[in-house]
Amino acid sequence: MSSKQEKTKARLPRGFVDRTSAQLYAIEVMIAQIRQVYELYGFEALETPIFEYTDVLGKFLPDEDRPNAGVFSLQDDDEQWMSLRYDLTAPLARYFSENFETLPKPYRSYRLGFVFRNEKPGPGRFRQFMQFDADIVGTPTVAADAEICMMAADSLQKLGFQHHDYVIRLNNRKILDAVLEKVGLAGSEQAQRRLTVLRAIDKLDKFGLEGVRLLLGKGRLDESGDFTKGAELKDKEIDGILSLLTIEVGTAEETFDALRKIVDQSEEGLEGVRELEEMQAIFAENDTQNRIKIDPSVVRGLEYYTGPVFEAALLFDVLNDDGQKVVFGSVGGGGRYDGLVARFRGENIPATGFSIGVSRLIAALQNLGKLPVKEKTGPVVVLMMDKEPEIVARYQKMVMQLRSAGIPAELYLGASGMKAQMKYADRRQAPCVVIQGSQERESGTIQIKDLVEGARLSHEIKDNQTWRESRPAQVTVDEEQLVKTVQDILAAQKR
């Protein structure tokens, strides 16, 4: 056995990412902008825990001992299964049901947080990602669905996307349900096959019509050799479903006429078309019809949607991992889910909502060159020229004086000499450093070096001796002038 202690390998779990300060700043700015829109529409904040009892989440429960199909789960000490939330909607349904008597109805809320999927990771596909949701619970009117769509469009507009950059694509699950009923997929006994069909259609943008056809049939083999089992529908059934996806979208009225023909005499399907017509009238009245379009291919891959479904899609091209141009695609979606709260209350509570994929939006803004960038200015660094306790306390007092004036500052707390400390300040992107050695201390002075100006002048003064003699961008002032001098330097750097 080796006497050396075995080192633990530093490694990140697959499907998870670290986020830098710059990335976090961009996320914070983006979230603040979306929050402004949500609150302008009258929504209030809500936070729920990342863990819920597994039966509360519901959707991914398998017929096996450990409920881990699609979710991360653990068993509590009371032997109850808990799971990390896979979205923010199921926890909202639980919260609304628990607090039904005290909440206003309709209840408008927005939630921000990480969700978790125990799925195969891949490029741009993570097991932990952030969502920003807004929902209205307690009203059946499609005016609520229309308002959610308009709010989604306004959120993208607020982030800097232009009208030609995006579209909110809209359909109604009742129309698809009518088509599924025609091909024999109605009833609870067909629930699993129906869910497989929904997920297959939801891959239309990714795999195209032929890929969806394979997933509706026997299954699809991807480029890596992985096989995804299909819904095993017959060719005639597949053709019936694909006829909905291939409707040519013209004017709104032409699209509605085509949808009525597809659903035939199905009352549920015709009701779905009427709801879309009501929403279209609202969009036209509010001049948003050019940003929100009827698209029969939108289904959303979750079983619990019961009415209008919508998806926010970005329309510009980006390069994929193979260097090919592809449309950026979906950055969020949602719909009506009138049955989700019924699991807790035994009665249908109408609800509708929308979820924005924060990570996808960050990538989109980066592609357009619109990602918020923080000014690359770090804290003022006070160098530690002497490590005697009473001297360290004196340095710390300087730091506190700067902080009290609202100036970010830190005391160098490493063990290196002055040269390494200066390199540290550069790496921290400090605007200036404060230096007080024994000579300055005896005279009650400090040296303040403007690193920004110094870097600029270094390109002009090439001779080392001249540089050392002139000591550019460096001033010596009395200790009591510390704050004012630093303030003047920072102000000059901004000019």
Swiss-Prot record:
<dbReference type="InterPro" id="IPR036621">
    <property type="entry name" value="Anticodon-bd_dom_sf"/>
</dbReference>
<dbReference type="InterPro" id="IPR006195">
    <property type="entry name" value="aa-tRNA-synth_II"/>
</dbReference>
<comment type="similarity">
    <text>Belongs to the class-II aminoacyl-tRNA synthetase family.</text>
</comment>
<dbReference type="GO" id="GO:0004821">
    <property type="term" value="F:histidine-tRNA ligase activity"/>
</dbReference>
<keyword id="KW-0963">Cytoplasm</keyword>
<dbReference type="InterPro" id="IPR015807">
    <property type="entry name" value="His-tRNA-ligase"/>
</dbReference>
<dbReference type="InterPro" id="IPR033656">
    <property type="entry name" value="HisRS_anticodon"/>
</dbReference>
<dbReference type="GO" id="GO:0005737">
    <property type="term" value="C:cytoplasm"/>
</dbReference>
<dbReference type="GO" id="GO:0006427">
    <property type="term" value="P:histidyl-tRNA aminoacylation"/>
</dbReference>
<keyword id="KW-0067">ATP-binding</keyword>
<comment type="subunit">
    <text>Homodimer.</text>
</comment>
<dbReference type="Pfam" id="PF03129">
    <property type="entry name" value="HGTP_anticodon"/>
</dbReference>
<keyword id="KW-0547">Nucleotide-binding</keyword>
<dbReference type="InterPro" id="IPR045864">
    <property type="entry name" value="aa-tRNA-synth_II/BPL/LPL"/>
</dbReference>
<dbReference type="InterPro" id="IPR004516">
    <property type="entry name" value="HisRS/HisZ"/>
</dbReference>
<dbReference type="InterPro" id="IPR004154">
    <property type="entry name" value="Anticodon-bd"/>
</dbReference>
<keyword id="KW-0648">Protein biosynthesis</keyword>
<dbReference type="InterPro" id="IPR041715">
    <property type="entry name" value="HisRS-like_core"/>
</dbReference>
<dbReference type="GO" id="GO:0005524">
    <property type="term" value="F:ATP binding"/>
</dbReference>
<protein>
    <recommendedName>
        <fullName>Histidine--tRNA ligase</fullName>
        <ecNumber>6.1.1.21</ecNumber>
    </recommendedName>
</protein>
<keyword id="KW-0436">Ligase</keyword>
<keyword id="KW-0030">Aminoacyl-tRNA synthetase</keyword>
<dbReference type="Pfam" id="PF13393">
    <property type="entry name" value="tRNA-synt_His"/>
</dbReference>
